[in-house]
A protein has these predicted regions:
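Acidic helix N-cap motif at the loop->helix transition within catalytic regions
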Residues: 16-19, 40-48, 93
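Cell-envelope/extracellular polymer assembly enzymes that use nucleotide-activated donors
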Residues: 4-6, 30
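A short, glycine-/small-residue-rich helix N-cap motif at loop->alpha-helix starts
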Residues: 58-66, 71
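Acidic donor-binding/catalytic loop of UDP-sugar-dependent glycosyltransferases
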Residues: 41, 64-65, 86-99
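Short, well-formed alpha-helical segments that are part of the catalytic scaffolds
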Residues: 9-27
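Active-site nucleotide-sugar/metal-binding loop of Leloir-type enzymes
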Residues: 68-80
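Short, structured coil segments at secondary-structure junctions
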Residues: 27, 49-50
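A conserved acidic beta->alpha catalytic loop
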Residues: 24, 34-45, 58, 85-86
Length: 99
């Protein structure tokens, strides 16, 4: 059985990592990112790559709130979730290793 996998993340001003992140996560069924106030092209680049991306502001900053909000972007039919940062790179074969 093939599982539906979602890679999800929180981002802010990480446009320099978007392409590398999306390329590494390309085997995922879904990629979802909660942007917490970027002033660069992070949101635009993620959208252009087909990522599920939403924007919010969290004041005062609370990582737990950001993480919980990011999880709301995960589609309901997802079987496995992987949390990553945009500056992280998934190793080749990551999907097969999970399945």
């Amino acid at each position: 059985m093939k599982h539906k996998i979602c890679i999800y993340a929180i981002a802010r001003n990480e446009e320099q990592f978007v392409d590398r992140f999306c390329d590494a996560a390309a085997e995922a069924d879904y990629i979802a990112v909660l942007d917490t106030g970027s002033t660069d092209r992070t949101v635009e680049k993620l959208s252009d790559r087909g990522v599920i991306v939403r924007q919010t502001t969290i004041e005062p900053w609370r990582f737990d709130v950001a993480r919980n909000l990011s999880m709301l972007l995960i589609p309901r039919d997802t079987d496995l979730c992987v949390c990553a940062d945009l500056d992280e790179v998934l190793l080749p074969g990551w999907r097969a290793a999970l399945e």
